Amino acid sequence: MAGVFPARTHIAKTVEHLFRLLPDVERVKTQVLLLSGSTTPFRNDTDRELALRQESNFFYLSGCDVANSHLLITARPPGHNPLANATTTSTGSSIHSTLFIPREDPLETMWSPPPPTLDEVRKTHDAHDLAYSDEFVSKVTSTLPQLGSATIHILPQTAQFPNVPATVLTQLAVAGLTPPPVITYLLPALHSARLIKTPYEIDLIREANAISSRAHEVIMRVLGKDMKEVGGKVNTRKADSAVMPGQWRIEKEAEAEAVFVASCRREGSVHQAYMPIVASAQHAATLHYCCNDRAFAWGPINADRRDLQVNRHEGHTHNGIANGHQDEPTLAPQVLLLDAGCEWRNYASDITRTTPVGNGGRFTSEARAIYQLVLKMQNEAIESLKPGLHWDAVQLQCHKTLVNGFLKLGIFKGDASAILDSEVSSAFYPHGVGHSLGLDVHDVPSASKPEPVTASGTLLALGPNVTTPVESIHHPSFYRYLRLRLPLVAGMVLTVEPGIYFSPHLLAPVRNSPFIDHEVLAKYESVGGVRIEDVLVITENGSENLTTVGKEVEWIERLSSGEV
């Protein structure tokens, strides 16, 4: 992505939301924002550095990935004398930012690369002024007396955020320059600003999705290459021999994770947006399964068997018996649910694909039926997306499609409306259809639901007329884990990720449901789980899918079987 990260644009958006949130008596004052970036992380009780990932709010306002940096933002309300060397927002406020980065420490340069110089940062960052981090305290305490009546805003001083240095807060208190810093408004203002993405941000998310889409395809192709060359038979390579990338096979969840991450890294992505979920067979029924430590189930095994078992520590089971003699083991029919996405310049992707493993690289009849139903849920949801549509309505439609699909498969029985009202579908589809995505994979939680309001009762960012659909009141379990509860607005970026799961934990409370044909259900439980997830941006007239990897059954099977 070319060009300088538009930090001033993001500061202006945040300041506009901040002034909207403030009580009337505070809006006439100058507002001062103090933020600190992430510090260099270390492994516990050692001097070994860990990978740095900048705190999202700090990066949003600075575009700075340098550890131990700080930010001072001053905003003067409309109608007041503008600040020197400042930017004027669309509402008439003047804003000025100073980015502080650490000096080079000659003693540290032997061990680690030095931070950029001020001259280098001036060419690559969108701040009004630059200074060194060791000047942060003096700059803050010298600036405030010049501003008159001012309110200082900081993020909550909790472990969730890098805290502003205590020396700054102490010096402010000693000097008696202002009332104590306020933590009420800055985070909601940031979340509201981040909810609607700029074209620059959307391009970063598009690139993250392109890289992750190719990595998902790599997984399918490696599985297919293995299926074509050795027919899914047990690997006989020696554990102590080097294996080149072109010889890699995927027989374990960890191997799939390794190939996915390697594919992203070789394309320049530094971080995964979240811990990959690599779940085979029944493990796919656990929504956030991040263990990724099991081998795939092995046979020989008939596709109709429901007792796919994997020893967690020993890996493969190589004792298949057929026709009274030892038979060469092959991969058992199962699915691999891979929910993984990388970041590009700290902006996330979030993609899930469910791929057949074993069975010649093709879905069993039961897995295919469930996959096609989930795909129908997702396609209908995507087709409905447009500004003004309430996200609750998308969630409800997914449940309706599931109910009708289960009736056709014979898993459900009875009247569709009665089944929907019973909320039994929540046992199979317990989570929300999607969430906001941006600098964080579960982005801006405080702005994704309608609770945060201004002092006058106006909903953040989206106006006063947002209401929850009446239908939502009648199906509370459908929305319990829905992370977005708003009408859609152009510029929102969100995931669409319905799924169907056969989790013993979730099914236990509905085992006696009169709406379930338990004999039919038993035939599908070995599927484990299926989820399909894409990232979309809401446009003026609909949506654009930023995820490019295929998801049609025929396309996936062609890759996973080695046909192409």
Report each predicted region and the residues it spans.
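Active-site neighborhoods and metal-handling regions in enzymes and metal-associated proteins
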Residues: 1-564
